[in-house]
Amino acid sequence: MSNVQRPTFNSPRSSVLWKLLFFAIVAGYCLYYAPFGVNETDGGFLTGLAWQVLNGKTLYYDIVYVRPPLSVWLRALEIQFLPEQFAVLGERWIFYGKVALYSWLGAAVLAKGERRWQLAVFGFVVSAHCYPPMAWHTVDGILFAVMAAFFTHSKQGLNLLIAGTCLFCALLCKQSFYPLLPIIGVFLFLEKEARWKRIGWFFGGFALSFVLFFNYLRQNNLLDNFLKMTSGAASTAQAFQHGILDYFRITPALALPSILFLLPVAWWFWKGRNPRIALVAWSLWLFALVASFAAITWLRQDHTAPIAQSRVMFWVAVICILPSVLRLKAVGRISPSFLLLGISWCASVSWGYNFPMLFTTPWVLAGMEVTRVLEDASKPIRFPKPYRFLLLLSLLFTFRIAHEFVYRDGRRSEMDVHMGSIFPQLSGIYSDQETADLYLDLKKLATKYGPNFKTLPAFPQANYLTKTTPPFPLDWVVNRETNGDNTLIFKDLQEKKPVIFIQKYFRDKIESDPELEVTRLLFQRDKVVEETPHFWVVTNHDL
């Protein structure tokens, strides 16, 4: 037996340091990353829908929305309560607040003391990565789902009631969270202490929320439309593709070196031999994983998401807990990890961001656990504490490189135009001159032709920025956002006869992309009355 003492990682000074790091990094992201860039697609998606609600429209009646409603309502509340000059910047701060909160809550479920704050720090940095800060239904769903997981650890009936309500709120954000109901049911069943009492309280809260929501739909004659719009958003084949098959899509350039690095690690876990080699190989692989993303981003010179890297780490987490699940060994200990990994998986079932990167806490913990186990087996060469800080610094540096290429905008270093000088709602937001010219073009056209206008196919927050009433039942007019049913759009087009501003950015896609059916019909049949650097203005709709 070695007489090397295991160091105490829960020293008060070190614990305070990680707490300070957590809050400092979150504040730093709000100040350093939130003000830069703006886009005309995802960035205003929920804002546009919320603006429709605030203009007196009703979801599923005169607003087309193929997801459950909660995120739209939450964004409407934000617009109501945030000062106008803080509407978009505040939205981004709230995004970072949500990611920080669910990263900490997930860490609180999985760890204690200093380790909890370490996990929260790494969980936040990796989950936030270079994702564009904005109101988003997936982020809301994760927050409520992790809150449900957090409150299920309580033995008190009220907390379990809250947990059931939180889970229903997660399901009201996005359909991909529906599988959480059986997952969390299994989790509660595996908790032997006061099992049936806890299940009763939890599902009591869930059932109460369910009854209240569907009673609202029934009383407002929205139930049929709600079921029709939300049930056709994705096919079984799409769910299988994004929920299962996509996890095997890992580029060979990353997969093959990973196999070489991880062979010594697998050999130690199987045979218990050469732990020092395994620890060195594992540590080098982690740094190589981070470096590979930095290198790919810099080579592409464009916004890049860590798709393959996140899938590899998800597989690491699955491999870590799967043997215990299959043998029903230490179920009480591994079930929280299983539950949170389920949340990460549900969040990744998506049309666009179909990889487990928005909630990374469970697979970050898996990486920390592998490191801890290998350290314990290699005591003579234990890595010092700065190892964790070096990894944190490498992550922060890597994501700074990634943030240089702002999502669907330009380079951060070239963004020196204050967008608040064009629209007050964009106060505190900076972009480059090209983007500023686009927004100036919109403002001039809205002044000339407004207030009855619509941008196509995107620019979902155009009516919000110009403070005009949206004439269409949705703002991002693509077939996937209508389930291919454009009846309400054509109805509003005939009745309200808005002037249409078609974005030239989509000129190469209008003729061929089946998603742009409405834009293509209008562009082909309507009369172009004016052309600006960024838009075609069309009128005289005859469909």
Task: Give the label of every model feature segment.
Residues 13, 180-211, 226, 231-240, ...:
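Perimembrane helix-loop-helix junctions
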Residues 34-49, 60-77, 85-86, 220-222, ...:
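Extracytoplasmic catalytic/substrate-binding loops of multi-pass membrane glycan-assembly enzymes
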Residues 66, 181, 403-480, 498-509, ...:
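Short periplasmic/luminal acceptor-recognition loop of GT-C membrane glycosyltransferases, typified by
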Residues 93-114:
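Transmembrane-helix motifs of polytopic, lipid-linked glycan transferases
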Residues 128-129, 159-175, 180-187, 207-208, ...:
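Membrane-interface alpha helices of multi-pass inner-membrane proteins
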Residues 131-142:
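Short acidic/glycine- and proline-prone juxtamembrane loop motifs at membrane-interface regions
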Residues 140-167, 315-320:
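Specific aromatic-rich, kink-prone transmembrane helix
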Residues 175-190, 259-260, 356-360:
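Transmembrane-embedded, aromatic-rich helix segments that form part
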